[in-house]
Amino acid sequence: MNRGAKVKTNGDNLALSTRAKKLLTKSIDTLETIIDNDQCSPQEKATIALKILEMAGIFTEFKHHSVDKLVAKAEEKIRRLQSQYPQINLSLSEPTLHQQSESIFLPGTYGEIKNFLSPEENQKIITEAIDKKEEYIKSNTTTKANQYRQSYVLFSQKIPALSALIRERIKQKLPELLGQLNFSPFEVAEIELQLTAHNDGCYYRIHNDAGSEKTASRQITYVYYFYQEPKAFSGGELRLYDTELKNNTITTHPKFQTITPINNSIIFFNSRCRHEVMSVVCPSREFAHSRFTVNGWIRKKMN
């Protein structure tokens, strides 16, 4: 009986191993498809490439015959990314998580600059945002959560001149903004940027912008508002919540600030603060009548 049971267990293990191989192969193929998509940001591609290597490492436990080829292919993707985007530091080591024993309270405060651009620059951005309607893609989140966010995004690579203008103005204003937000001066590694359109029914549920290893270096979130006047939508307010951080957990307090979109204004706030975009009501549903933003994150250079 014991011998029969042993044979059955080995068979079960073999079946499990085969299923695991198939599942891992399918998962890696899916990741490779995503990494070849030009709509992914460089940081997302880097994360996916590292995930492929991680899965390839798991694959070696099964002594799969094509592991060497798989790893070489994944490493080649990383080398290609590194040469294409030298500003991204790709590390193959495991991230170190630091426990946070003390509670940190972040009030939902923000800095605001009205008339951030000249009227001519503002109008030029509105025109470009509308003209590139066909180039937007549906937004998602870093966690790929369903029904958590609805909007349309245009990445910075599609709008190089606009991106350069916004980044330069932010750099000029950053010293005074750090004081307003109670930040100590820090070396900026990158200013991430994207253009987002919210039309009828669009929203973004409560979240923060620096809640993962991938986003940990984000310090300040910014949102530049612009739209056609007279305004053809309502809603779309930003709620900025008092937030508490302790032991790698985030608590959203009930108190919040409400920020109403104002054309040609920009706001800045701590990326760790929880916030949400309320639903937009746009009766015409015309894309040109959307609530537009240039939004992004100021990253700190990490040692």
UniProtKB/Swiss-Prot annotation:
UniProt KW keywords: Dioxygenase, Iron, Metal-binding, Oxidoreductase, Vitamin C
Which EC class is this protein assigned? oxidoreductase
Every copy of the Fe2OG dioxygenase domain together lies at 173-300
KW 4Fe-4S (keyword) present? no
Q: How many and how are cofactors bound here?
A: Binds 1 Fe(2+) ion per subunit.
Give the range the annotation lists for the signal sequence. none
Cofactor dependence: Fe(2+); L-ascorbate
* InterPro entries for this protein: HIF_prolyl_hydroxylases, Oxoglu/Fe-dep_dioxygenase_dom, Pro_4_hyd_alph, Pro_4_hyd_alph_FE2OG_OXY
**What EC number(s) is this enzyme filed under?**
1.14.11.-
Gene Ontology MF, one: iron ion binding
Annotated protein name in UniProt: Uncharacterized PKHD-type hydroxylase sll0191
Species assigned in the record? Synechocystis sp. (strain ATCC 27184 / PCC 6803 / Kazusa)
